[in-house]
Amino acid sequence: MNYNEYQKALAAINKSAKRELDDLQGRMYEVQRMKDDKVISEKEAFERDQKLAEIFDSVKNRYARSAERLKMNFAKQDCDIKVGDIIWAVSKGAAKVLKIETIKLAAFDYPMLKLFGTQLTLYGQPYKKQLQHPKGGIYQKDITSINGEPYTYKTRV
């Protein structure tokens, strides 16, 4: 699963959760309307509201667990880049080849690489991993994860 697939799966979970929770909220409003129109008693309205609130909480928790499980599965994948890999980056038109010595990560945060003793934050241009093509030559691949954490590039504001 790449980062785009992860984002799509997360969006699908969120969409399903929103649809189900909106339906439950609609049912809660319906109970309130019936109570206001004196179709059902206060006691019955309270009991129905209580039941719907419990269902609402359980649905919300179920989708939160699904999203957390998806996040953990994505993070456990083999990563694109490891210590010792060679990457290159284009910075102001000049390509730089960098060897990764250590990688420090905060979970699902923008990673920081220690390169030749200096700190380099991966902001700005997307970094690429140099790969040796089986038929000879070198080609580049966008880095989507570093030590299992998703990596997207972002310009510092």
Model-derived features with residue positions:
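Short intrinsically disordered terminal tails
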Residues: 1, 76, 80-81, 149, ...
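Short, charge/polar-rich alpha-helical segments
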Residues: 1-25
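Short, flexible coil/linker elements and helix-boundary hinge sites characteristic
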Residues: 14, 18, 38-39, 78-80, ...
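Extended alpha-helical coiled-coil "stalk/arm" regions
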Residues: 16-53
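Mixed-charge, Lys/Arg-rich low-complexity intrinsically disordered regions
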Residues: 48-83
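Intrinsically disordered, low-complexity, charged/polar segments
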Residues: 65-69, 118-157
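Basic/aromatic-rich interaction segments and small domains that mediate binding to polyanionic partners
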Residues: 91-131
